[in-house]
């Protein structure tokens, strides 16, 4: 077939060197290579970008306005492309309304199921709600007191956008005189103009009555008319009282509580009809967190117990005046530890004295005096200032003392009581979503046989769709998640696999899928399931391209493309392409070296014993952790492992890192639940090294992040030419006026908006991309301008600045972590996650080590090739050799086998996790039968021991 291949000719995007490549269609293809070799440039920035661009360009210009505009990649030609879908790790929603259920669309099916099959109950008495007859409605109204005025309303429109002219005209034609719109009364003979883009509620006034004898017949007729107009709903608006809602469909005869209509939107927490009115469907409020204001209750006010903006203790301050007044009233001094103060005193300090006044003494330059005033409380004060301020800085400052607290009305369930009273199998929609996916599948299997024939007929197809999607999530190792889990709390790997299941559920064929390391965050045990899922996607008739470093995934692929041979300027070529055997045979392929065994990451011959001290987390209870005590040996390379969802991130990121950051670094983050951490006296600081960008603007680069650019600017300012002109280091900054080119403000490029076409970036015509003005560029050091230096690779700069020890030392660390190919001025936004992390590592290596630092890394091998992992391990071992402690969350067995100590959590994910399954050296963990990590580690250690015995 002519169309069974994707043919790429002359790809030059980023560092690609005029690449020509032919890929088979409808196959499972892995693209691999060193970090920075150009594989993402080929997969995402060339193949996906062109497939997506062509599809978008086929749409109208109006439609293109609402879609992401993509640049045309730098490539001569690509043939055989299909519409492309990219599933990367960067698109996790941070919208608090976005959950696993909404992202996977399972929640939409659940809303449909509960609307059609759910059994409504009274939220007060729990009685099953049944239909009301007109007689029952009349009886309820006749219970009103004699003389009570009321009107019968027909709600023809409920919370719907539009001008509603059709309904208003129909009411006029039917002879009605009045209508109630959004709570306001209107005469129908006047012109009524409603805002088109706002939701409205329109209620026709059917009749106006006063309670007296003999109105039963008229009331029944009016109610029947209202029911006919609305399809079964009527309201009785009691003047000066509460409105009574009646339904021919569902209502509690005892409490009169009725549900107007069991529609899917009633079960949506994003719709005012069903969302909890207090929290508007968020389930939480942002409130000032008293734990952040009083993080250490062992301290007194004078010692700085209060950590709140405007309330830090200082002698002679207004804060001190209030503290002394509170102390006099509630019996404490400024030297009383918070934990020894009465509950009443602490409550007054935080939440105020209500109407009670306190005595305060104020002394200033005009004299002294006694004042009596109420105290609003630190919490109330901060919340009021947060509401009233227009300053973004102040909002951010006070916001750092706030955290989400559960809504007191819905208790975090997001929906109204009447909605939560609708159940299937005894569980409401929120209860179902709070179960793990594993438990949800069991619940469906247990309850499906109990449904009536009618329920099965209505909900059978819906339940099938829900089951399929839940099983897809289970198949990619996510059965520990709940549908209620906020999408913003998911890791990159989790969110990517969730979107992957959505695509499988859509069952498209003839599509090109491009995925970015889907194995991230996945334990080896679940990797086989993921590979089967990717093959399933291929078998539907799709082409699946995966950027991946995982050995099992490579060995399962139909076709492998190895990009290299090195990284950056040393990469950008196709080193090898074909089957696993072809890659292993390729002489220039570093991937082939590791797959064939020509190179390998060796197990250390000895394990460090540590320095004898420990950091001990007592009673860890965050998320699914089950009140466990965990000991971290100091002075060792510690690896925390376990099945996805077993509690690793809760233990390390939420408890250990946040507690250490608060205690040692003065951070304000709220740590996860535990009884405390022992051994803090043995460490002096904690450093978290993640894969977040080193800067979010093109102005950030490796030179500015590591601080080496300050030293370079100083060197330029000390040249004879600079001294003669009076140029200081600031002259050589591209961020401030003076030395930079003002035409492009030091960017070197200009952005030209093209509206319906992608924005065009062109080199600045004035400085020709050099960033600086002509006068600044006349100053040279060793015949090079400051712009020339920014364009140097780290390798070149190490040689160039060899006689500048301070600069050379910082540059050498960048070289040590494998970033020799990166230019000093390379924009931070173009660095991969792995590269950004290694820049941070280099920055830490360049510092003078105290030997008492704890380094915490979460899956540092993400985005790293086997050769990069090898180099990363060497860097981490250097940090530990200096006496520091490195704690790593990891699934990569090559890194795990090199650790001194392993803490394995499990045994499963979610509610079945949260325990320590095994701990000790890799050899000790490998012998624990219940440890999944140990099961995969054992053959690896045995293989290494065998090769070592053979002298290989």
Describe the residue ranges of each PLM region.
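Conserved phosphate-binding elements of NTP-dependent enzyme cores
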Residues: 1-952
């Amino acid at each position: 077939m002519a169309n069974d291949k994707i043919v790429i000719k002359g790809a030059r995007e980023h560092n690609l060197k005029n690449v020509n490549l032919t890929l088979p269609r409808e196959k499972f293809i892995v693209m691999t290579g060193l970090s920075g070799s150009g594989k993402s440039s080929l997969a995402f920035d060339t193949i996906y970008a062109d497939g997506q661009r062509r599809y978008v360009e086929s749409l109208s210009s109006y439609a293109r306005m609402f879609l992401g505009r993509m640049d045309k990649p730098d490539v001569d030609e690509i043939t055989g492309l299909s519409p492309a879908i990219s599933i990367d790790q960067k698109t996790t929603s941070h919208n608090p309304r976005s959950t696993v259920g909404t992202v996977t669309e399972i929640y939409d099916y659940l809303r449909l199921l509960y609307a059609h099959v759910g059994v409504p109950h009274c939220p007060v008495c729990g009685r099953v709600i049944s239909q009301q007859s007109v007689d029952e409605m009349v009886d309820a109204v006749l219970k009103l007191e004699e003389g009570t005025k009321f009107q019968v309303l027909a709600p023809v429109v409920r919370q719907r956008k539009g001008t509603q002219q059709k309904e208003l005209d129909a009411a006029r034609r039917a002879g009605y005189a009045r209508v109630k719109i959004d709570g306001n009364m209107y005469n129908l003979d006047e012109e009524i103009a409603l805002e088109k883009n706002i939701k409205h509620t329109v209620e026709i006034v059917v009749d106006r009555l006063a309670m007296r004898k003999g109105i039963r017949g008229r009331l029944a007729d009016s109610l029947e008319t209202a029911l006919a107009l609305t399809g079964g709903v009527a309201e009785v608006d009691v003047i000066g009282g509460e409105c009574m809602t009646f339904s021919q469909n569902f209502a509690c005869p005892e409490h009169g509580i009725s549900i107007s209509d069991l529609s899917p939107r009633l079960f949506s927490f994003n719709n005012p009809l069903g969302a909890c009115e207090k929290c508007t469907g968020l389930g939480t409020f942002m409130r000032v967190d008293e734990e952040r204001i009083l993080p250490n209750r062992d301290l007194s006010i004078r010692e700085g117990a209060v950590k709140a903006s405007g309330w830090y203790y200082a002698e002679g301050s207004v804060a001190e005046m209030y503290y002394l007044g509170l102390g006099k009233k509630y019996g404490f001094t400024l030297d009383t530890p918070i934990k020894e103060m009465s509950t009443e005193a602490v409550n007054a300090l935080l939440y105020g004295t209500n109407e009670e006044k306190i005595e305060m003494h104020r002394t200033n330059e005009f004299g002294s005096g006694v004042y009596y005033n109420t105290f609003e409380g630190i919490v109330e004060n901060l919340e009021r200032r947060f509401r009233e301020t227009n300053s973004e800085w102040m909002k951010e400052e006070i916001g750092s003392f706030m955290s989400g607290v559960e809504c007191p009305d819905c208790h975090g369930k997001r929906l109204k009581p009447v909605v939560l009273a609708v159940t299937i199998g005894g569980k409401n929609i929120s209860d179902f979503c709070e179960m793990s996916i594993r438990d949800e599948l069991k619940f469906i299997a247990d309850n499906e046989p109990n449904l009536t024939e009618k329920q099965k007929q209505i909900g059978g197809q819906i339940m099938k769709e829900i089951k399929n999607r839940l099983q897809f999530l289970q198949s990619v190792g996510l059965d520990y998640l709940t549908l209620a889990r906020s999408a913003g709390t998911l890791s990159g790997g989790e969110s990517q696999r969730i979107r992957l299941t959505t695509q499988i559920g859509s069952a498209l064929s003839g599509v090109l899928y491009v995925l970015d390391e889907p194995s991230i965050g996945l334990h080896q045990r679940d990797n086989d399931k993921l590979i089967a899922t990717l093959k399933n996607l291929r078998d539907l008739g799709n082409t699946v391209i995966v950027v991946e470093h995982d050995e099992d995934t490579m060995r399962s692929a139909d076709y492998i493309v190895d990009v290299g041979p090195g990284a950056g300027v040393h990469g950008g070529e196709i080193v090898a392409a074909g089957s696993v055997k072809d890659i292993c045979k390729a002489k220039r392929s570093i991937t082939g070296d590791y797959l064939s065994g020509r190179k390998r990451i060796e197990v250390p011959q000895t394990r460090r014993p540590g320095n004898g001290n420990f950091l001990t987390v007592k009673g860890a209870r965050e998320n699914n952790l089950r009140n466990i005590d965990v000991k971290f040996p100091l002075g060792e390379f510690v690896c925390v492992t376990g099945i996805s969802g077993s509690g690793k991130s809760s233990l390390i990121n939420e408890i250990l890192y946040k507690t250490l950051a608060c205690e040692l670094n003065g951070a304000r983050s709220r740590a996860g639940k535990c009884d405390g951490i022992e051994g803090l006296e043995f460490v002096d600081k904690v450093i978290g090294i993640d894969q977040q960008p080193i800067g979010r603007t093109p102005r950030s680069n490796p030179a500015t992040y590591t601080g080496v650019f300050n030293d370079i600017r100083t060197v330029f300012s000390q040249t004879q030419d600079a001294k003669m002109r009076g140029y200081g280091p600031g002259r050589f900054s591209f961020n401030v006026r003076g030395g930079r080119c003002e035409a492009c403000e030091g960017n070197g490029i200009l952005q030209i908006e093209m509206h319906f076409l992608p924005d065009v970036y062109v080199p600045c015509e004035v400085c020709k991309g050099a960033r600086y003005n002509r006068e600044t560029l006349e100053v040279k050091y060793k015949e090079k301008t400051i712009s020339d230096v920014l364009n140097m690779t780290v390798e070149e700069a190490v040689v160039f600045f060899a006689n500048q020890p301070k600069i050379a030392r910082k540059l050498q660390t960048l070289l040590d972590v494998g970033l020799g190919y990166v230019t000093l001025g390379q924009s931070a936004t173009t660095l991969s996650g792995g590269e950004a992390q290694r820049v941070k590592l280099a920055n830490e290596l360049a510092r003078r080590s105290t030997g008492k630092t704890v380094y915490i890394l979460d899956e540092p091998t993400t985005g790293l090739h086997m050769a990069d992992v090898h180099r990363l391990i060497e860097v981490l071992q250097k940090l530990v050799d200096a006496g520091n402690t490195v704690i790593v969350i990891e699934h990569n067995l090559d890194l795990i086998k090199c650790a001194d100590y392993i803490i394995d959590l499990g045994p499963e994910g979610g509610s079945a996790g949260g325990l320590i399954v095994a701990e000790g050296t890799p050899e000790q963990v490998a012998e624990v039968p219940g440890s999944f990590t140990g099961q995969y580690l054992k053959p690896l250690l045995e293989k290494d021991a065998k090769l070592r015995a053979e002298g290989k």
